[in-house]
Structure formats: structure tokens, C-alpha cells
Amino acid sequence: YSQPDIEWNKRPEIDRWILSLLNSLIKDVDNYLDNYEPTRAGRAISDFVNDHLSNWYVRLNRKRFWQGGLTDDKLSAYQTLYTCLETVAKLMAPIAPFYADQLFCDLIAATGRENVYSVHLSNFPVCHEEQIDKNLEERMQMAQTISSMVLALRRKVNIKVRQPLHVLMVPVLDEHQKESIEAVKSLILSEVNVKDMKFVDNTAGILVKRIKPDFKKLGPRYGKIMKALAAAIQQMSQE
């Protein structure tokens, strides 16, 4: 890690996305720990690493990591991943002190980025608000959700991902949602191996809508009439 950092605004969108999530995570974990909620802090870190960093960012950027030569694109990918790992080590230090210290020391031994010999002697991460892009986070979350649903449908009907499909029909609620999905369209199509995507405004005849009462929320408020209310809800038409 001897090269200068690639400027944040010059990094690819997917790098800026994971850095946005990372800074949101710093903010959340700092708040949880200040309020003596280590369990919520630990879960937030776990969700970030498993759902976003490992299952999405690293997997989608394998070609960038493996490409020959040290281009700015490859350097940006490695620097972004390193920043995430080092920051996660610092965030988890109060919760998992030994593993966090091992991860931090392994990273520092390879790069010499810090002059301390333990994660517990380093400063706690600081959130960079200017790097948080909620619109970008929302778009990527839609890409993850849609991709997950399509892959689940493939498994349900036993159609393997390696078999390309012609078109993916996506119902949208409004123009904002349509624009958000359009921005990550190519990513979704690549992830689920579909050639094209069409947006559906009127889902009549295509989707079967079902409504199910949330007993946990409705029960305390409508306990005495909950049974009748549930029956009325389930009898609602698709319109």
C-alpha cells in the first residue's frame, strides 16, 4: 500500500457505494456503543461484512482484483477493500478483541499504514459524512433485493443461473423507483443472467397479490376484534 490513495470522487460507483455503507456503519456502531448496545453494534458489523462486503462487493469485483498490471481501477478496488477491512477491525475491537487485533495486525504488517502494534491502541474510526450517499445506497439495495428474488425464483422452478433468460419483468410503484432500478439495470441483468428488463406499471393479470395481517403490530391495538379484522383483510381484492 505504498501508492497514493485514489481520490474518493474518482473511484467507480461500486467503490463509492461500499464506502458510503462503511461510513454509515461507523455512524451506527458509534451510536450503538455510546448507548451501551453492543449486540446491535455486532449485528450491524456482521450484516455489513456478510451481506455487502463479502457477498456483493468482493464477488462482483473479482475481475478487478485479478486483472494484470496495477491500473488505477485495480488499485482503487484494493484500497477500498483494505479500508473496509481495517475499519471493520477497529469497529469490532470492543466486541471481539482478539480476532479484531489479529486482523488489524495482519493488515498493518503487510502495509505499515499505522505505527501502533495493536488495534486497541489505534483511534476509533471517524465517520466521513461527505462520503455517505443515501441515493446510491438505495439504488444498490434495490439491485441486491431484485437479484436475490430472481435467483430465488430460478431455484424454485429449477432453472440454473447459467441458462440465460430473455426478459425480466419488474413491477414499479412510481417514477422514482423506476429511475432507481434503471440506474442499476445492467448490474441486475448481469447478476441474474437475463438479456433484457421491462418495467410493468399495471400488474393486473401478471401478479397475484396477497395481503397478510401483521398480528404482532395489530394485536395490541385491535385485540378484541383481531379475528374479524384478519378475516376482512384476507378477503380484500387485488385492487
Q: What residues fall within each predicted segment?
A:
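Feature 926 captures the class I aminoacyl-tRNA synthetase adenylation module centered on the KMSKS loop
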Residues: 1-239
